[in-house]
């Protein structure tokens, strides 16, 4: 009836109601599928980590700041998952600068202290390299071997790194999608952390579990997703939110503007640049694509500005 109403509506309202009915059905089945997957996760036997208090305290004592109450709460939620017998599947949400990386470091330390491998995937090579350097510094006082694996790593070096990973001589592996290629076999993965990967759907997350014996999974995002939408998109995941910024950090203000406000946005950016500050414009494409003509590329925008 709704399909008929979409194509042969009696009036404009009839067409709108028919469309809403079909949209509701699509979201309903999507949510139902996600909830079924979450139910399956509850029956999956995961890795039961044992809390290593000494190492935890040692890591926290070397930091030149204290965790916020929100970080402590979120870490407690993650720790509870790690110590349980079921597999963790959790989404960690928090603004840029809220301290998600430190929480991820605590989680990865826990899995490494239990003699499992930690895996951290970033969406780009630049971010992977930044995280690699960051974790090297954060974990410099611990005797763990950390490797970086991205698509630009030379073939000979890649083979050596992959061999170290397969033999269990690598404790923490940081990289991009190269971490999940079929040819790469892990020795004993305990926790997989994925940073800002929105296109990693339910099926892709299942494929990660096949890399080991149901390793725990933590997905991090700085995108301010409303709880209701997060449950729709990531319905098979539990949700933790860092809703507090460290002292001295300003809260991130996020705004959405229509296309007709583009000129005003550029004027605002120019004002900030004139004040000696910086502005960043992120484009979906580097160069113009015939397949996606409506999207503005970085090269085009650079010439226009």
Language-model region placement:
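Generic recognition of stable, solvent-exposed alpha-helical segments in well-folded globular domains
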Residues: 22-26, 69-73, 77, 91, ...
């Amino acid at each position: 009836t709704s399909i008929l109403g979409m194509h042969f509506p009696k009036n404009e309202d009839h067409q709108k109601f028919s469309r809403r009915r079909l949209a509701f059905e699509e979201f309903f089945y999507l949510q139902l599928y996600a909830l079924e997957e979450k139910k399956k996760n509850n029956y999956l036997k995961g890795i039961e980590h044992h809390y290593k208090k000494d190492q935890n305290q040692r890591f926290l004592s070397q930091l030149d700041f204290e965790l916020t109450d929100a970080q402590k709460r979120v870490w407690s939620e993650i720790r509870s998952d790690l110590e349980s017998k079921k597999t963790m599947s959790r989404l960690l949400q928090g603004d840029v600068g809220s301290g998600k990386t430190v929480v991820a470091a605590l989680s990865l330390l826990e899995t490494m202290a239990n003699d499992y491998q930690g895996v951290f995937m970033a969406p780009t090579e630049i971010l992977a390299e930044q995280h690699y350097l960051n974790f090297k510094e954060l974990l410099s006082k611990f005797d763990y071997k950390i490797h970086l694996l991205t698509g630009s790593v030379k073939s000979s070096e890649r083979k050596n790194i992959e061999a170290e990973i397969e033999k269990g001589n690598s404790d923490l592996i940081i990289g991009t999608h190269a971490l999940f290629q079929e040819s790469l076999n892990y020795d004993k993965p305990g926790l997989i952390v994925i940073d800002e990967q929105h296109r990693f759907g339910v099926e892709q997350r299942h494929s990660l579990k096949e890399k080991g014996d149901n390793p725990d999974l933590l997905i991090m995002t700085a995108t301010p997703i409303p709880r209701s939408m997060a449950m729709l998109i990531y319905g098979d995941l539990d949700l933790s939110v860092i809703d507090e910024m460290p002292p001295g950090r300003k809260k991130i203000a996020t705004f959405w503007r229509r296309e007709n406000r583009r000129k005003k946005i550029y004027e605002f950016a120019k004002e900030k640049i004139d004040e000696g500050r910086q502005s960043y414009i992120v484009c979906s494409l580097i160069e113009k694509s015939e397949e996606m003509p409506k999207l503005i590329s970085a090269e085009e925008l650079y010439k226009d500005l």
